[in-house]
Amino acid sequence: MTNAQELGQEGFMWGISNSDDSGGGCKRIEKEPLPSHPSHPSPEIQTTTVKKGKKRTKRNDKNHEEESPDHEIHIWTERERRKKMRDMFSKLHALLPQLPPKADKSTIVDEAVSSIKSLEQTLQKLEMQKLEKLQYSSASTNTTPTTTFAYAPSSSSSPTALLTPISNHPIDATATDSYPRAAFLADQVSSSSAAAANLPYPCNDPIVNFDTWSSRNVVLTICGNEAFFNLCVPKHKPGVFTSVCYLFEKYNMEVLFANVSSNVFWSTYVIQAQVNPSCENQLLGNGLGVVDVFKQVSQELVLYFSSL
């Protein structure tokens, strides 16, 4: 056998066949060639590795998809909570006009607590004044003498009725016809004057005049020791009424009546106020009158509305 044949047969193995039907023989078995680069993995191993990597990646995506909705809900809830807190602090800040525009949250809360305590004290004071007025009115009703007398109407009128005039002099029923009309009216006037003198806050001026001042947004009408403010401002301006009440409190004024009406563009405020009676003597000592206080308040309202 030559060298070429030996080299050509190196890739084959010779084996002995042990089959029963033949007496013996040889069988050539092909031998698989050895890999030329044993360091590189086979294609099957690479496929298996890729498949395992894909499975692992799919498992991670599934977990991410399961956790993602809860995380988004948590983010949305936190965002809404912060937005609600900002709105609440903004509304609370609008109710406190004495604070600067850029006040921190702690300052807003402290000022709100102080304002609430001050309002509670004011409420207690007003309740005491109300109770005193009720006691005074009940006492004056019990001490005022009244006279009941009958009068004789015509035949076409209703039966004899009972009247309660304000008079301190009893009148006999038989002297009703002879009682002069002028004397009766004089008694009525004198009784009314005596009753008016017992009022807690009487009006000193017998004749009351109306004085009116007007500007673009403010109309002031003064009647005695009371004033009527007509205010017209653009709608959707927060804190207007609160600022007006704060200004009244600054000048020791009490709000007796307030009405608010609005349309699509404007809001109208009608406020009846008076100077606190306990502060009138202090104003007179400072050389100021009630009218001067009302005018000063109106001027500050004009400046405030012009800045809106």
Curated annotation (Swiss-Prot):
Domain bHLH: start-end pairs: 69-119
GO BP term, example: regulation of abscisic acid biosynthetic process
Tissue expression summary: Siliques. Not detected in roots, rosette leaves or flowers. Expressed in endosperm cells.
Record's keyword annotation contains Translocase: no
Segments of skewed composition (Basic and acidic residues): 60-76
A Gene Ontology term for the protein's cellular component: nucleus
One Pfam family matching this protein: HLH
Highest taxon above the source species: Eukaryota
Null mutant phenotype: Small and shriveled seeds. Retarded growth of the embryo after the heart stage, but normal morphogenesis and pattern formation of the embryo and endosperm. Shrivelled collapsed seeds.
Gene3D superfamilies: Helix-loop-helix DNA-binding domain
InterPro entries linked to this entry: BHLH95-like, bHLH95_bHLH, bHLH_dom, HLH_DNA-bd_sf
Region of interest (Disordered), ranges: 1-76
Name of this protein: Transcription factor bHLH95
Native source species: Arabidopsis thaliana
Species classification: Eukaryota, Viridiplantae, Streptophyta, Embryophyta, Tracheophyta
Gene name of this polypeptide: BHLH95
